[in-house]
Design a protein with these regions (language model features):
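Active-site neighborhoods of metal-dependent hydrolases
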Residues: 29-90, 106-117, 123-221
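Metal-associated gating/positioning segment near the N- to mid-region
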Residues: 1-4
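Short glycine/serine/threonine/alanine-rich loop segments
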Residues: 6, 96-98, 162-163
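Active-site mouth loops of central-metabolism enzymes
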Residues: 9-34, 75-77
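Short, surface-exposed connector motifs at secondary-structure boundaries
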Residues: 93-101, 127-128
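Conserved, mostly hydrophobic/aromatic
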Residues: 8, 103
Length: 221
């Protein structure tokens, strides 16, 4: 159904699909990667490309439960940094109006603001959009080694002219979290409220996790 006054459009999820990861791992030329990204956009009629936990969803299928920005995946031996770099370049060179839409690694992990900054650096100055950045802006100070690093993130992103971001606003109360980050949704399923959850691969190309959650002002995340 159409919702008046609301612009809508789909993002095609890349960065965990075997075809792209195989191209990157065997050193394919950027033009070949650009052709693949263009094909995906035409076939799906999406308005842009999104990468969720770059390489991490694919690594999860091979029993990796975490993948940092400069850590190689078990299967393809490539890093999230390289995935972000080649996708950001493809989107830019193809002239896609919306920059690469990035859900960073290590969502909700204490100290993850460092990997968020490294993910931004991976784009090497090309335009990117960091989504729900509040979940990627945590430090590890305090009695429980968990703190806000929003000041550090804000100071850094204000220096990057080609970077945009959104907060990912949370409202207190019952909700259902839905994410392509099956690695993180699997890790969080013990917090499900009520105690039901779903996690699956979608045609072995991306991930999906649905975890009901009740946000309160006492929640760390």
């Amino acid at each position: 159904a159409d919702t008046p006054f609301i612009d809508k459009g789909g993002y095609a999820l890349l960065g965990n699909d075997d075809f792209l990861l195989d191209l990157i791992s065997r050193g394919a030329h950027q033009s070949e990667i650009n052709d693949y990204v263009a094909f995906i956009l035409k076939a799906t009629q999406c308005i842009g490309i999104k990468v969720v936990n770059p390489g991490g969803i694919n690594a999860f299928k091979f029993n990796q439960r975490a993948l940092n920005v400069d850590e190689n995946s078990v299967r393809y031996k490539i890093t999230p940094r390289k995935i972000v770099r080649v996708l950001a370049r493809a989107v830019y060179e193809l002239g896609v109006p919306h920059p690469l839409h990035v859900h960073c690694s290590n969502l909700g992990v204490p100290g993850n603001f460092k990997s968020t900054i490294e993910t931004i650096k991976a784009a090497e100055g090309l335009p990117v959009h960091i989504t729900h950045i509040q979940f990627h802006s945590y430090g590890n100070n305090g009695d429980r080694n968990f703190s806000s690093a929003s000041a550090e993130i804000t100071e850094y992103i204000n220096k990057i002219p080609n970077l945009t971001c959104d907060v990912g606003q949370v409202l207190f109360g019952q909700t259902a979290t839905m994410s392509g980050d099956s690695m993180k949704q699997h890790a969080n399923h013990s917090h499900a409220h009520p105690d039901k959850w779903l996690c699956m691969d979608i045609e072995c190309e991306a991930g999906c996790g649905v975890v009901p959650f009740k946000y309160t002002d006492q929640s760390f995340v």
